[in-house]
């Protein structure tokens, strides 16, 4: 659906060159909700603005539905952009226009006739839960309602792709969740491909099917959300994951545990139906080890259960080896944190 090949953006001034993004390549499947996460200044917003050529790339290609946007003329690009919607962190609504007229604006620019515009706006208002706000002005709306107007406006021209640049960063947690649920519903209902730019791993956890981690202008890691959460390869991905699944033990506890003979500290991760398995009870019974729970959490990656357990296992070397074999047979990821 979307292929980004070796995309680079360099800002040049008289004194220096600043590399905003460098040699970025991504394949984004049709119908995916693709998260691009990074710290402030990593280059993620530049990347999303290059995708629809609000920023002109210095090099590389952006291919959507087989068409290279970087090779298009101004007229061709204007037509292509009608199939790419975008929503922003700070909404960018026209304060002098009503909700109805804000949603209608891109249709007016695209040259749609008045009856077509009216029909489309009336179709979008209930979709975003604003059917009773058509003639209200932005100043009378909450932050969440303003973003719903932004979403409806972005959907007005029936796009195939929706770009979301920090779309929930200005919202409170409850409103954030309602906006994410709306985007998830739109994705499932219309098969829309959504690209989510964010610095919050909880957004990725809640809604994304795939994720790319961008760090210092380059892609540090990418893949299906489940794979990245369970087996992160980069230090920056591990740091982001720890913000939603904190699993580091206090140093004083680790020092105390280090005095326990014949013990091992392990972290176990499980996904899906494994979350309801009696892992610890079976482990103690089958392997004759003692298992002390030090930390545990369980949550969802989209609709899939994901959990971690940090255990102190006590037993002789043979029992500990048998415990690892038992866990491996159940396809659980096991990481040894500390041997004693």
UniProtKB/Swiss-Prot annotation:
Q: Which residue ranges run through the membrane?
A: none
GO MF annotations, alphabetized: ABC-type D-methionine transporter activity; ATP binding; ATP hydrolysis activity
Q: Which residues bind ATP?
A: 38-45
Record's bilayer topology term? Peripheral membrane protein
Pfam families named in the record:
ABC_tran (PF00005), NIL (PF09383)
Q: Which SUPFAM superfamilies match?
A: ACT-like (SSF55021), P-loop containing nucleoside triphosphate hydrolases (SSF52540)
What's the catalysed reaction? L-methionine(out) + ATP + H2O = L-methionine(in) + ADP + phosphate + H(+); D-methionine(out) + ATP + H2O = D-methionine(in) + ADP + phosphate + H(+)
Domain ABC transporter residue range list: 2-241
The protein's Enzyme Commission number: 7.4.2.11
Q: Which CDD domains would you find in this protein's record?
A: ABC_MetN_methionine_transporter
The entry's keywords: Amino-acid transport, ATP-binding, Cell membrane, Membrane, Nucleotide-binding, Translocase, Transport
* Classification via InterPro entries: AAA+_ATPase (IPR003593), ABC_transporter-like_ATP-bd (IPR003439), ABC_transporter-like_CS (IPR017871), ACT-like_dom_sf (IPR045865), MetN_ABC (IPR041701), MetN_ABC_transporter-like (IPR050086), NIL_domain (IPR018449), P-loop_NTPase (IPR027417)
Q: Where in the cell is it found?
A: Cell membrane
Gene Ontology terms, cellular component aspect?
A: plasma membrane
PANTHER family, sorted: AMINO ACID IMPORT ATP-BINDING PROTEIN, METHIONINE IMPORT ATP-BINDING PROTEIN METN
Assembly description: The complex is composed of two ATP-binding proteins (MetN), two transmembrane proteins (MetI) and a solute-binding protein (MetQ).
- What's the stated role of this polypeptide? Part of the ABC transporter complex MetNIQ involved in methionine import. Responsible for energy coupling to the transport system.
What family does the database annotate? Belongs to the ABC transporter superfamily. Methionine importer (TC 3.A.1.24) family.
Q: What is this protein called?
A: Methionine import ATP-binding protein MetN
Question: Where does this protein come from, organism-wise?
Answer: Desulfitobacterium hafniense (strain Y51)
Q: Encoded by which gene?
A: metN
